[in-house]
Every structure is written in structure tokens, then in C-alpha cells.
Amino acid sequence: MPDTSDGGGRLVLVTGASGYIGGRLVPELLRAGYRVRAGARTVGGLRDHPWYGDVEPVRADVLDAEQLRAALDGVDVAYYLVHAIGGGGDFEETDRRAARVFGAAAREAGVRRIVYLGGLLPKDEKLSRHLRSRAEVGEILMASGVPTIVLQAAVIIGSGGASFEMLRYLTERLPVMVTPTWVDTRIQPIAIRDVLYYLVAVAGIREELNRSFDIGGPDVLTYRDMMQRYARVSGLPRRRIVRVPVLTPRLSSHWVGLVTPVPAGIAKPLVESLRNTVVCDEHDIAAHVPDPAGGLTGLDRALELALTRVRDHDVATHWSNAEVPGTPSDPMPTDPAWAGGSLYVDDRSCVVDASPEALWRVIVGIGGQNGWYSWPLAWRVRGLLDRLSGGPGLRRGRRSPTALYTGDAVDWWRVEEIDEGRLLRLRAEMRLPGLAWLDLSVEQDDRGRTVFRQRALFHPRGLVGQAYWWSVAPFHDVVFGGMQRNIARAAEVAEVDGRPVDVAAPTGAPASRDRPAAR
């Protein structure tokens, strides 16, 4: 059995370190005691990763033999986590050439093992081009002369992965779906945490193996079932799914492209692969790697992990924070812009002719009797509607007119985070088809000027949530623009008078002069 907890300081190369799997594998390898060389076509693409300072970054274009020779020098285990999906052109030929170049370079460098993550392959079915290419890459690497372990997985469940994001967007945005026949194809999904567990564990196997292993979670179900399970776990009503035989995989890939923000170049091969049954044919990996402690992760738990940050009202943190995520299922700041579900943001910044302290006093005094510095009638009407629907409305006020603490109620908001003098984060507790936050922060620009930044964030729940955001978006300039101007003006007045301003300006009135934008 491998030692999955101690890499013994051995050096591993992770190609595709800027990608979804690679970016999450690197910190797992570091925690297991390995030294990590993180490879990518451009090293600059690695700098935004939170683990960048703990690895040796290296250029590793898998089509460039010279770069690979340098990247593989002294490496014990090399992870091959690249493929040409979404790249356009003849991606099969590109994948084929890259695997040959990499295998030859690894053999020349004396690499002990190659580890490749491929796709789960059906039996006795015509493969999609995507699955066919993944299978061929595995065969090329196993024939390279370097012992190679190929882990074959179907749909990987974790925020940021293309397959999961497609599932997320389809389910959230379409309460009623007319779908092709592939919705009833059998699939054995696996949680990202289990994929990473196996990827790390196989590096510690001392036996010389040159073969593929099927890996999958404990659930076998259809794509239709997966969408219904996602809806249930995320709190959405059961979806109405009508299957029609006329939608071919090619046509349905265009449909997916219209409904979701997943790029067409990625969505098309994924959809075409859904026509194939992808269920594990064996569990031979168990003879070399024990199941994770507590067993493999079921679909519902995997979905819960992928949605934990949303469920726990922490979306604003994980979409904007560059810290290492708590679990592999969490979003990462380097995930593509279309990953993580919809998050709508109204982001405004302006320079304030006041000290940071004066601006902060106004910010922490917001709400209650001081009001919200913008269109009082609109806030009162919204508060009344919230009360009528069973929400708190504006009646809660605030505990103290001058002091705020984490957990305090402020009208229909709750103080989620305070970074004294810098940030006030409020979470909405009003009745909404989604989750909402308001960030009010004090910053300074490179000229030493005080900058007020105001962000309203909304994570919609289902199609109703999408419709809600776009229905109120035309009023944001009046509501949020007025709030920003009046908070800034209140701070300037407070600076001159030496005291905070207690009364919000009426109707989102503009400032008395043009206010420079922050740069």
C-alpha cells in the first residue's frame, strides 16, 4: 500500500498546473510532503494561485521537447494533466503529438512514473471524439517506456469543473427542459476530493505498474437524476424534464451554449461524450490504494461540498479572496470567469475628500435612524414589501447608532464581517430569490487619496433569481449610485464639521461637484 501522507521530499512535476485539476492537486501534494514543480505554458498564468510561493514554477509546453527536458530533470513522478479540449482545430492530433513528446522526454529524464487522468470508457460503444482522444493519450503514455498509471473518471463533481458547471447552470436556469436522449445515459460521477485523493496516493505506490484504473463514486445514475439531485440539494423545485429524440448531441451542444456560459469549445465535446455510458467496469485500484477514510463520497455529499460556500452565505468571500480554499470542492480565484455559478456585482469606487477615519465613521453608522443615504422612499417601500412577505423589513433598526459588531442586525441586513477601518460586509436577510451582500470599504489609491468602494453582490437562485436581478438592475444607478455619492459627501461634511452626519441626503441626490473616480 502507498504512503499517502508523506512524499518524503520527492520532486513531482504537475503539468497543466494552471488548470482545474492541476491547480487543486498542487496544494494536496504539498500537504503530502512532496516538492512540487508546477508546469504551464506560461509561468505568468501561475502567479495568481495561492500556492505560487511554495512551488518551483517552470515553463512546460507539452509540445516543446526542450522545455520538457528541463521541466522533467530530477523528477520522480510526472503528472500529465493537459488536453486540447476547447482549443479548436484537430484536437485529437494535438493530443496525440503532445503525449508522444511528453512520454519520450519523461523516458529520457528517467522519470519513475507518469500519472494521467483520463476519461472513463464505455464497453462496446462508439466513443465520442473527446473520449476517444483521452483513451488514445493514455495508450501512448503507457507505451512510452515509463510506467504509467491512468486514472479513468467520468463526471467530476466540484465547483469550477466544466462538467459540474454545465450541470449547475442547466439545472439552475431551466425549471422546464426539453432535452435530448442523453439525459438518460448512465453515469458514475466522482467527487473532486476523491479524484485528488487517488492522484496523490498513486504517486506513493512503489510497485511498477503500467495500466489503467477506473475510479468512480458510489452512485450510478442518469444525467436526469443528477439534475434532479442538484435541484434538491440546492433548494430548487423539482425540474420538469421532457426527453425528445430529435436533439442530436451536436444540436444539443449549441443549446447548452445558449443556456450556459460554458464556452462552446468546451461544452460541445462534453455534450457529445454524454451519449456514452460511463460506469466503472472494475475497482482494481483498491488493491493498491485503500478507499478514502469514511468511504468514497456520494453524489449528494459531493454536491453539498461544491455548494457549501453558497449555502453558508460565503459567496462574497470565495469569489473575491485569494486564500487557499478550505476544501478541493471550493471555487478558486483562478477558476474561469464562467465557473462558480452566477454572481452579479454592482461595483462602484470614488475618491473622497476626507480622511479614511471620517469615511469609516459614516460607514459604520449606516442604517437604523441614519438611513441608507439613498432614495428613502424606495427603501421604505422595499422594507414594507419584505415585512408583508414575512421578512424583517426595516423595523429591526440597529443596536447602537455608532458601533457595529459581527452578527449585529442592521434593518434587513446582518453584519457578516468587520475589518475595522477597512471593510463592512453586510448579508441580506430580506426575502430574496438568492443571496445578497453589500460591501462598504475604505481604501487608498497610489496618490494617498481616500477611496470609497461599494459593492452589491447577488447570487441568484434559479431562473426567478436571474429575472429578479435584471428587473432591478435599471434602478441601480439611482439606488446604489445615490448611496455612494451621499456616503462620500457625508464623510466630507463630517471632516469639515468634525462630527458624523446623522441624516441621509434625500432621493439619492448627487454630490455638489463632480466626484473623481478611483483609478
Predicted regions and their residues:
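Hydrophobic ligand-binding cavity/cleft-lining segments
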Residues: 203, 297-300, 304, 308-393, ...
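A conserved amphipathic terminal alpha-helix motif
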Residues: 465-505, 510-513
